[in-house]
Amino acid sequence: MNPRRKKRLGIVLAIFIGISATIGLMLYALNQNMDLFYTPTELVNGKPDGTKPEVGQRLRIGGMVVVGSVRRDPNSLKVSFDLHDVGPKVTITYEGILPDLFREGQGIVAQGVLKDATTVEAFEVLAKHDEEYMPPEIAEAMKKTHEPLQYSSEQKQGSGE
């Protein structure tokens, strides 16, 4: 092999290794930043396909705030509350100001890190902003586990429909 071909081969190999390393690092970063959505039941029992989150994994969890479960620390902005759907309850801990629409019995989505099998340390809490609106992930999960609500004509009339 002449020196010119060796040099060209070295350049091509260096470019190939550089591109491969870049793609590998991008895939690693995307995998680390992926937040999977769970309901409280899926978090405790696992998803139907068998996946279950590991302690330390970032995730999103959605459900209804259990009435009477909100506990506030009087000396800080720390709040903890329980979430449920149709199964087990999951405790959410959060430090910060909760959204104005946050209430017991209301639907929320929390984004955070799984601390143990039934505790999530949230760094973001989002409250439902409309009676009719529900995030697509929660709507899909609720559709699987709940019967649709049937409203009487008086109830529909009272809601302005």
Curated annotation (Swiss-Prot):
One annotated GO molecular function: metal ion binding
Gene3D superfamilies listed in its UniProt record: Nucleic acid-binding proteins (2.40.50.140)
GO CC terms in record: plasma membrane
Coiled coil: none
UniProt topology in membrane: Single-pass type II membrane protein
InterPro entries: CcmE, CcmE-like_sf, NA-bd_OB-fold
Residue ranges of the region described as Disordered: 142-161
SUPFAM superfamilies, per database record: Heme chaperone CcmE
Positions with a binding annotation for heme: H129, Y133
An example Gene Ontology biological process: cytochrome complex assembly
UniProt keyword list: Cell inner membrane, Cell membrane, Cytochrome c-type biogenesis, Heme, Iron, Membrane, Metal-binding, Signal-anchor, Transmembrane, Transmembrane helix
Transmembrane segments: 9-29
Residues in compartment: Periplasmic: 30-161
PANTHER family: CYTOCHROME C-TYPE BIOGENESIS PROTEIN CCME HOMOLOG, MITOCHONDRIAL
Annotated HAMAP family: CcmE
Stated family: Belongs to the CcmE/CycJ family.
Protein's recorded name: Cytochrome c-type biogenesis protein CcmE
Gene designation per UniProt: ccmE
